[in-house]
């Protein structure tokens, strides 16, 4: 077992917070699972995708590497990752389905015709990157470095889509809140490790990892504000029509 996953060898101070750590990890897993399910439901409700295929293919590639190729030995982590992978396949299918029929895809003939190839090569490309990082750094370090990058990409692209479209179809407060909760607990669990087991996890407490965490919080915070504002504008427009 790779050092860092073997909690039996951890110092007494870490063992004291181990139940909290597993709780945070479980809450993060549940939050993202709810996000994926809510994303599917919202896309079918509005007949419009609300997330970026770039971010989704990146997430799926990460899940393939760390749920199948380098699965963590912790049973709870293994179950969570494979649950994400299973549901994320349907998220990508649903998103691609409605992206193909959207006006954006219709105005881009190449994307409209070869969307399935863009998705496939996107997954393969990101998979190779996550795998390469796991070889370079070690699976456990790549798990978190790549994971933090995935959080920032997902939050940044979600904000970009919302601002670019100027409407909230395909999106919901539930998608945003579950994404934020899932991500914030994942970040908290990482820094909890570095605080109480610095001999093994000290590498994760550095300026770049803090930047990733800060970027995610800022981007998702801005998303919440922009979503609230856009919803208000939409409600005013409906009131005028009525």
Curated annotation (Swiss-Prot):
<keyword id="KW-0472">Membrane</keyword>
<keyword id="KW-0812">Transmembrane</keyword>
<keyword id="KW-1133">Transmembrane helix</keyword>
<feature type="transmembrane region" description="Helical">
    <location>
        <begin position="117"/>
        <end position="137"/>
    </location>
</feature>
<feature type="transmembrane region" description="Helical">
    <location>
        <begin position="79"/>
        <end position="101"/>
    </location>
</feature>
<comment type="similarity">
    <text>Belongs to the paxB family.</text>
</comment>
<dbReference type="InterPro" id="IPR039020">
    <property type="entry name" value="PaxB-like"/>
</dbReference>
<feature type="transmembrane region" description="Helical">
    <location>
        <begin position="20"/>
        <end position="40"/>
    </location>
</feature>
<dbReference type="GO" id="GO:0016829">
    <property type="term" value="F:lyase activity"/>
</dbReference>
<dbReference type="GO" id="GO:0016020">
    <property type="term" value="C:membrane"/>
</dbReference>
<comment type="function">
    <text>Non-reducing polyketide synthase; part of the cluster A that mediates the biosynthesis of chevalone E and its oxidized derivatives that possess a unique five-membered lactone ring and can synergistically enhance the cytotoxicity of doxorubicin (DOX) in breast cancer cells. Within the pathway, cle7 takes part to the biosynthesis of the molecular scaffold by catalyzing the cyclization of the prenyl group initiated by protonation and ring-opening of the epoxide to produce the chevalone E intermediate.</text>
</comment>
<feature type="transmembrane region" description="Helical">
    <location>
        <begin position="143"/>
        <end position="163"/>
    </location>
</feature>
<feature type="transmembrane region" description="Helical">
    <location>
        <begin position="207"/>
        <end position="227"/>
    </location>
</feature>
<feature type="transmembrane region" description="Helical">
    <location>
        <begin position="50"/>
        <end position="69"/>
    </location>
</feature>
<feature type="transmembrane region" description="Helical">
    <location>
        <begin position="172"/>
        <end position="192"/>
    </location>
</feature>
<keyword id="KW-0456">Lyase</keyword>
<comment type="pathway">
    <text>Secondary metabolite biosynthesis; terpenoid biosynthesis.</text>
</comment>
<protein>
    <recommendedName>
        <fullName>Terpene cyclase cle7</fullName>
        <ecNumber>4.2.3.-</ecNumber>
    </recommendedName>
</protein>
<dbReference type="Pfam" id="PF25129">
    <property type="entry name" value="Pyr4-TMTC"/>
</dbReference>
